[in-house]
Amino acid sequence: MAAVSALCFALVSAIAYLFLSSATLHRGDKMKITQLYVYPVKGLRGCALKTAPIGPYGVVGDRTFCLQKVHRDGDGVRYETMLIGYNLQMALFVTSVDYDKGLASVEWKGRGTAFDVAMGITTPDTISFPLKPSTSGCEKLEVNLHTSKASAYDLGDDYSTWFADRLGCEVRLVFIGDGSRPVLGSIAPNSPGGLRRARLSHRVRSLFPFLAYPAERLAFNDIAHFLVVTEESNDQVSSRLEDQCQMDVTKFRPNIVVKGASGAFVEDYWGELAFDGGLKMALTANCYRCQSITVDYDTGATATDDRGMAWKKLNKDRRVDAGAKYSPVFGRYGYCFGSVADKKFRVGQGVAVAHVNAQRTVFDWPHLTTFGTTKK
């Protein structure tokens, strides 16, 4: 009986500790969401939202499609995930979503640019497809994204030809469907590696099956479910640019932009955010930047003014992650805790910093420490 009582006391104490620790906020930055974005097709430009419904892999519909470049040789067919860091012309494609109709749309704005390989193509420069298309009869292929693999559905010739005509190469549009990708390294907060470096309260929670969260997985998001950036840091990047050039925050491809941080780049140390309404988000990794931040949206090429120098100027003093020491850091990758069914982010929503790390996190996704440092 004494042993049972002791066990019950320990259990109650652990649960009380979890709730008390989760209720404690860092007394610092109190902010608001000012911008929200979703990117239905990986690598293409995103779509601004007023409210962002949350699903199991981030914003609903975020990066559930991607383009696979087809390589054919004597050994057969090989597929390569198209990434904007190596294919800046992908910025000529602008996406939008209509959640009420369940549709994603893509508009190509490449007419008259150096990438206008579509001369003579008479099909409309806008195409739409369901956010959750039927996969009946679709062929499956393996997608390899940063060595994290998933089985995906090829959506057929009509959609793929539309993109191929405008990219000038053979591509396939694929849909993640019921598939998902593993999170590598210790970036997923509820993976074994993530829990080893998590705060004590999260490690204690994982010991109880009825409280533990499952390990996170991904669609075609690079590294995490969400990317959070601040207006203060973006303004600091603008201050580095000459000739009154301004940094467009969308080139950092965030899901959530917040305003009200105490300074530029203070988010490097943020470990957890608490949003009004009860949502909590673990921030587990820095986002180190590729060449996509240098693109000119009007040309699909590196900007010829000082905006084209953004990566180099950041690289002078923003190589602050020992795990990705050749690239500048801007923004934090995050995952929401617990059930997010039917929950939403909204512009104007309050945000508080719930935990500040003593040191910057170290990026440890295998074989991904030099991505985007050069152009292919």
Task: Please give the residue ranges for each predicted region.
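Metal-cofactor-dependent catalytic cores
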Residues: 1-376
